[in-house]
Amino acid sequence: MKTYRIAAIPGDGVGTEVVGAGVEVLKALAARDGTFAFQFDHFDWGGEYYKKHGRMMPEDGRAQIRNHDAILFGSAGHPEIADHITLWGLRLAICQPFDQYANVRPTRILPGIVSPLRKVNGPELDWVIVRENSEGEYSGVGGRVHQGLPIEAATDVSMMTRAGVSRIIRFAFKLAQSRPRKFLTVVTKSNAQRYAMVMWDEIAAEIAKEFPDVAWDKMIVDAMTMRMVLRPESLDTIVATNLHADILSDLAAALAGSLGIAPTANLNPEGEFPSMFEPIHGSAFDIMGKGLANPVGTFWSAVMMLDHLGEKNAAARLMKAIERVTADPGLHTPDLGGTANTRTVTNAVIGAITAENL
């Protein structure tokens, strides 16, 4: 029997609750399947670790998880610690050195969930957003000078490379090719940003020739927000820069009903490093410890993890279980307008997994 080693990193806030729920569900799924198992190694990195040690994770933290098959992550963010410290000290400290350059965020309206778009019932909104996850606006290149003085200045340099842009656009074309519609939208801001964004457009046109069976178009990012709201059915696979896709994917999650159900995969497609899977929602300290966090985003992220590991049947079973639960309004958490809690939803998904008719 294959045993997968999973690094479980809850992080901060409700991360502990949703990752714990995810571990329970994955254990139940493995027991139901019977052909594979999980070994979960738990790491207490995050804001509380920072308060004790002055850093978000140990100096040898990456070495500790380097040989795991995958990483299940919760959230990064602590009300007593600056956001740039929590993000760069933990999540990005894993993503970038592990070259998880493809951030993949599927978006669709699950059964039983209502979109705020009044004309959309479900099939019209079925997207996958591909976010460049290693460079661009979040390259970490920049600095501050003359701090505290009237002449203080700061820069954040958006660093784009031909290699980085080429690999994410090629990844997006391959993903679009694997989907029924075979359609890709490339999002930039090349009308105003005339160097790196123009390079994106040019590289997209070059790589498109490798995929003659994939139709594609390009959009300016501000116009893209309108298209997502007004013509969601016109979109399928979307690729954009680190910053642009970060923003667009949050909009997408809201249009699909809630950030609480949205998943993310941070992929190293070549398999040289472990990939990381996490819900989109943040640490949500306002509801921490109340048992109100929606675990569906973590469960859906676990589906993506299973698919990445090659456990296609188990991934499909878990997705069906999730959809069976979301279809019941009585199992909706407060972010979806319901009164269910994390425990109730987790138990329901486990019950669906073990049901004979799934």
Whereabouts are the PLM-identified features?
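Glycine-rich phosphate/diphosphate-binding loop of Rossmann-like nucleotide-binding domains
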Residues: 7-24, 28-29, 33, 149-221
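N-terminal glycine-rich phosphate/adenylate-binding segment common to multiple enzyme folds
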Residues: 50-155, 243-245
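Glycine-rich phosphate/pyrophosphate-binding loop and the adjoining helix
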Residues: 140-186, 190-194, 312, 317, ...
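Short glycine-rich or small-residue beta-strand-to-loop segments that form or flank ligand, phosphate
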Residues: 5-14, 72-77, 184-190, 300-307
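Buried hydrophobic positions in well-ordered alpha/beta secondary-structure cores of metabolic enzymes
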Residues: 12-15, 69, 130, 172, ...
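N-terminal beta-loop-helix "entrance" segment that forms/cooperates
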Residues: 35-58, 228
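Glycine-rich phosphate/nucleotide-binding loop
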Residues: 47, 104, 227-330
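Buried hydrophobic packing segments
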Residues: 22, 26, 204, 298-306, ...
